[in-house]
Curated annotation (Swiss-Prot):
Keywords: ATP-binding, Ligase, Magnesium, Metal-binding, Nucleotide-binding, Tricarboxylic acid cycle
Classification via Pfam families: ATP-grasp_2 (PF08442), Ligase_CoA (PF00549)
Summary of subunit composition and partner proteins: Heterotetramer of two alpha and two beta subunits.
Organism in which the protein naturally occurs: Caulobacter vibrioides (strain NA1000 / CB15N)
GO cellular component terms attached to this protein's record: cytosol; succinate-CoA ligase complex
Residue span, ATP-grasp domain: 9-254
Example of a GO MF term: succinate-CoA ligase (ADP-forming) activity
PROSITE patterns, per the entry: ATP_GRASP, SUCCINYL_COA_LIG_3
Residues that bind substrate: N274, G331, I332, M333
Reaction catalysis annotation: succinate + ATP + CoA = succinyl-CoA + ADP + phosphate; GTP + succinate + CoA = succinyl-CoA + GDP + phosphate
E.C. no: 6.2.1.5
Protein name: Succinate--CoA ligase [ADP-forming] subunit beta
PANTHER family: SUCCINATE--COA LIGASE [GDP-FORMING] SUBUNIT BETA, MITOCHONDRIAL, SUCCINYL-COA SYNTHETASE BETA CHAIN
Residues holding Mg(2+): N209, D223
Amino acid sequence: MNIHEHQAKAVLAEFGAPVPRGFAAFTPDEAAAAAEKLGGPVFVVKSQIHAGGRGKGKFEGLGPDAKGGVRVVKSVEEVRSNAEEMLGRVLVTHQTGPKGKQVNRLYIEEGAAIAKEFYLSLLVDRASSKVSVVASTEGGMDIEDVAHSTPEKIHTFTIDPATGVWPTHHRALAKALGLTGGLAKEAASLLNQLYTAFMAKDMAMLEINPLIVTADDHLRVLDAKLSFDGNSLFRHPDIKALRDESEEDPKEIEASKYDLAYIALDGEIGCMVNGAGLAMATMDIIKLYGAEPANFLDVGGGASKEKVTAAFKIITADPAVKGILVNIFGGIMRCDIIAEGVIAAVKEVGLQVPLVVRLEGTNVELGKKIISESGLNVIAANDLSDGAEKIVAAVKGAR
């Protein structure tokens, strides 16, 4: 689960991290009031969306020379006028895709005199079962660009949760960022604070970009992104309360109600599969045959008829879907349950696009019989390759 920047900074501030003063605003009046509280002389008006690249982003409906989603201004009236222009508009960045995201809230923050910019993040390293720390002197840039152009400027080390942060980690961070003296001590303190927050709140990722050195030689968290392990939210009601569903795909929200693993993509072929590995393989083979998947959808191993019906309805709710591939390898999951769910969903919502079904495993013959006797126009597939080839051909033939 992701949260907004202003929420992320509030969470980090609870653990002592040095963040600038700021206030969230949902209206131009609230933005102006926030600026008055801060007092100036410099204010930063920040769009709050779950995507990066806000500063270089473009608002729909404004000219090509218009400012982006992060603006530096010098008066309360400028804060108000910029808020009026930004709120309610769609901001398009390299991370939002062409559809962009509507800006429904702003973060009004005090300005900062920047001497240096760094990148710092903590994330779960699944390979080592440790917390990986990534640091770079190239702050304020996309870390992916740094990794591509100057990979030698990215430094990583891991922290073992069994032992926590040690002085050797402090020295590694100071060396990676080129810090000495008082700044090295501040970096050590910050690492302690961030690691404590990361572990206490079950974070999946903590990213600060940029972490700055101010003109008076202190570290400050200028931007922060936090992502939390969704499976841990039951023990963090304070974090769960920060969820902003307007930033999420409505289909993904609906899928979560049925414990379905669903991620919307930009393609045209909807996929319903059991098992994450098989789902990824299904998406790969669709691309191999010249089309693009419209989603990742794993119904899991213990899906009921109702769950399968819900999954099918979520797929068909996407207007971009021009065909559907159901690919089930029944182990724990029974093929007859999938068949009954698909039929129930088709009868309820109708079938306006080609549907290819590949079943294999537990109760496969019964599943195939249920589908063949349903009277529905379903294309049967013998294996995964056959299924992908048939759905791609059906979609291209329907154009």
